[in-house]
């Protein structure tokens, strides 16, 4: 290794404490004198006999070194050799210090932190992978459960979403497979069955967990695949048949592969249920129990169950499928996070495709002309959305620090009033007069919701926090309510009439502020227009205001999905409505069957006496007029959504066909199997019923 200049060692000490600095300097001085003395050993035997011990004071050593250099100057060659020796000694000392304080010098770990990576049985290669992601220490749930899992215990872990539950099972499972109890039984042959199965309620969660297993598992040559509905079945099947170590997936697709015989659990060592309470909420009870029940020898399988809450089904699940000696780790307890009482919390159903049209209208109706912060989950969506909203700026991780400061200064000063930001980029914002917060989707982490919504309603002010959600993922709204204590006020997207009225009010105020000096210039044209229009002055002025704010006509907007040019209708039949199939059958009595393809989002009312659904606005009159010719049927346009059911009473949550979600599942269970007239398995229409099965 080439020698480094002595100065190269100095930066290593910049961040050291004063005491450590002194100790290091003293040690360097001692080594330096010792090396110098050794070189003169042959010529100065008497001096060698009197050579100071390593415990001598630094001042005596400095005097001795000074005397040596002044009284007996060395030749040039000897001096060069001496400098080389000094360099070598100091560099060696630097390398020693590097080894000793490696984790702090590089800014990685703090050994004083009990949760530092070095304090756990994590292999060096995996530690390096974690450091590459900026992870220096384990989160509480990870630290608390690591040894329990690695030592082979079944586990029930309770922690809020977003607290690091994924790595709480990823890390110890990987270590166990490669360096722990399962090392000897590890297989690498073609077609091998999986050793790890992880179940999650949604494809988004499954993909996130799969990403972690794939990234960290690659360190040990472990392979992982992700299986979920709505994607290519064949490619997932081939991945399993080739042989895989870890399978991550949603219950429905995993069940398919199990029943087909593609997936077997003969070599299974771990099974993990993450977000177990959400699996209950989404109707996966039967699927989960069937999958867990396929393990023949449970004594050879370690089961890990993670959940934010422990409802009765989760308790029964743990008693039935986990060993009696299971461990429980609860980081939630009875605590309940609190959102600001000065904030009005609103939840608004909105399909992803409608966001760009709906968000500007939310701003117009709820911001009161003040500042708005819009939170997105990705920097790409932040950039895209800011490009669609006039007068807005994006703030995310790709924005340079200098530009970030310019953007924040402009937002604070009011140069622009809408900031579109990712959660990470918005940390540290301290702006008291933000009137409106919009979250484009429910965050996985309830703390993130409270943190974001708390950006408004500060310093004694009141504010509004609007959270958008896709109707089929309404369970995420319930989760945040449950974990945070927030009670959402459920609203529909601002209707074009609401937005137009708001814009008209602003335009009227602007007109009132126009100087009277312009009246003579426009009076003649105004009189001509009034005389020729045949309208009253008020009506004519109303049209002028509409034109001024860009409204030449008023469009319709769905109350159910926020989609433009769609209208929400309410159907009632004078008797109970149990399923979407019944609604479609009723509509078929007075509407052509081909028109029913345009019916979207059928949802049963909370009292079970009717159902709401969307149709193209141009067809509204056809439905209303048609219902008048059908006995005991009424169809009307709704101005405000009535209370709605979470899911159909049939209990199905993933019904078949193009309407494959909880609203359209047939009777007979959680996945739309065998329902009357609208059953079918996850978009394939399997299951009994009439002609609507395959079509819808």
Swiss-Prot record:
Residues 652-690 have a biased composition (Gly residues). Residues 67-77 have a biased composition (Low complexity). GO terms for molecular function: ATP binding; ATP hydrolysis activity; mRNA binding; RNA helicase activity. Residues 16-97 form a coiled coil. It is an enzyme of class 3 (hydrolase). Its main location: nucleus. A motif (Q motif) lies at residues 115-143. ATP binds at residues 159-166. Residues 27-38 have a biased composition (Basic and acidic residues). It is found in: Nucleus. Residues 357-500 form the Helicase C-terminal domain. Its EC number is 3.6.4.13. Residues 39-49 have a biased composition (Basic residues). A motif (DEAD box) lies at residues 274-277. Residues 92-112 have a biased composition (Acidic residues). The Q motif is unique to and characteristic of the DEAD box family of RNA helicases and controls ATP binding and hydrolysis. Belongs to the DEAD box helicase family. DDX21/DDX50 subfamily. This is DEAD-box ATP-dependent RNA helicase 7. It comes from Oryza sativa subsp. japonica.
């Amino acid at each position: 290794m080439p020698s480094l200049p002595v100065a190269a060692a100095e930066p290593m000490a910049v961040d050291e404490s004063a005491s450590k600095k002194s100790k290091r300097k003293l040690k360097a001085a001692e080594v330096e004198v010792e090396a110098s003395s050794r070189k003169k050993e042959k010529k100065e035997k008497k001096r060698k006999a009197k050579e100071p011990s390593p415990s001598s004071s630094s001042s005596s050593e400095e005097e001795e070194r000074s005397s040596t250099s002044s009284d007996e100057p060395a030749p040039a060659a000897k001096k060069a050799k001496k400098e080389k020796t000094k360099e070598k000694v100091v560099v060696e000392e630097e390398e020693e210090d590097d080894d000793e304080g490696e984790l702090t010098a590089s800014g990685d770990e703090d050994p004083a932190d009990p949760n530092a990576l070095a304090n756990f049985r994590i292999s060096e290669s995996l530690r390096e992978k974690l450091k590459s992601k900026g992870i220096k220490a384990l989160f509480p749930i990870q630290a608390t459960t690591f040894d329990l899992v690695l030592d082979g215990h079944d586990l029930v872990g309770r922690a809020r979403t977003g607290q690091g539950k994924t790595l709480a099972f990823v890390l110890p499972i990987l270590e166990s497979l490669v360096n722990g109890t399962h090392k000897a039984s590890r297989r690498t042959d073609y077609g091998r069955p999986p050793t790890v199965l992880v179940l999650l309620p949604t494809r988004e969660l499954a993909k996130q967990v799969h990403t972690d297993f794939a990234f960290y598992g690659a360190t040990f040559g472990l392979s992982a695949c992700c299986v979920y509905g709505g994607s290519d079945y064949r490619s997932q099947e081939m991945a399993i048949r080739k042989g895989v170590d870890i399978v991550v997936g949603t219950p429905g697709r995993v069940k398919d592969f199990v029943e087909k015989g593609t997936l077997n659990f003969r070599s299974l060592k771990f099974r993990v249920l993450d977000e177990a309470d959400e699996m209950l909420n989404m109707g996966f009870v039967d699927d989960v129990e069937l999958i867990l029940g396929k393990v023949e020898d449970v004594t050879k399988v370690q089961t890990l169950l993670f959940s934010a809450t422990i409802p009765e089904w989760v308790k029964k699940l743990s008693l039935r499928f986990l060993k009696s000696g299971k461990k429980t780790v609860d980081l939630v307890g009875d605590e309940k996070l609190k959102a600001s009482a000065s904030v009005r919390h609103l939840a608004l159903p909105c399909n992803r495709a409608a966001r760009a049209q709906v968000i500007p209208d939310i701003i117009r109706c709820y911001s009161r002309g003040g500042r708005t912060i819009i939170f997105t989950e990705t920097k790409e969506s932040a950039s895209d959305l800011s490009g669609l909203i006039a007068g807005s700026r994006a703030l995310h991780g790709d924005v340079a620090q200098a530009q970030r400061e310019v953007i924040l200064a402009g937002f604070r000063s009011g140069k622009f009033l809408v900031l579109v930001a990712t959660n990470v980029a918005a940390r540290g914002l301290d702006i008291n007069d933000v009137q409106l917060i919009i979250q484009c989707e429910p965050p996985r982490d309830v703390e993130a919701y409270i943190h974001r919504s708390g950006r408004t309603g500060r310093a004694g002010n009141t504010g509004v926090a609007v959270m958008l959600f896709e109707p089929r993922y309404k369970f995420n709204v319930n989760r945040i309510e449950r974990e945070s204590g927030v009670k959402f006020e459920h609203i529909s997207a601002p209707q074009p009439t609401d937005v137009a009225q708001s814009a008209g009010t602003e335009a009227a105020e602007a007109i009132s502020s126009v100087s009277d000096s312009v009246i003579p210039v426009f009076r003649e044209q105004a009189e001509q227009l009034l005389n020729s229009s045949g309208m009253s002055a008020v009506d004519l002025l109303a049209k002028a205001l509409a034109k001024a704010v860009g409204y030449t006509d008023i469009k319709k907007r769905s109350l159910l999905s926020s989609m433009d040019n769609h209208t929400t209708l309410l159907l009632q039949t004078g008797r109970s409505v149990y399923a979407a199939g019944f609604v479609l059958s009723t509509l078929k009595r007075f509407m052509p069957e081909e028109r029913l393809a345009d019916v979207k989002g059928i949802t049963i009312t909370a009292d079970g006496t009717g159902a709401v659904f969307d149709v193209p606005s141009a067809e509204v009159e056809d439905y209303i007029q048609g219902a008048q010719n059908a006995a005991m049927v009424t169809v009307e346009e709704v101005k405000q959504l009535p209370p709605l059911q979470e899911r159909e009473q049939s209990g199905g949550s993933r019904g078949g066909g193009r309407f494959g979600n909880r609203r359209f599942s047939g009777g007979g269970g959680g996945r739309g199997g065998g329902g009357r007239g609208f059953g079918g398995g996850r978009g394939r229409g399997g299951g009994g019923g009439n002609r609507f099965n395959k079509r819808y």
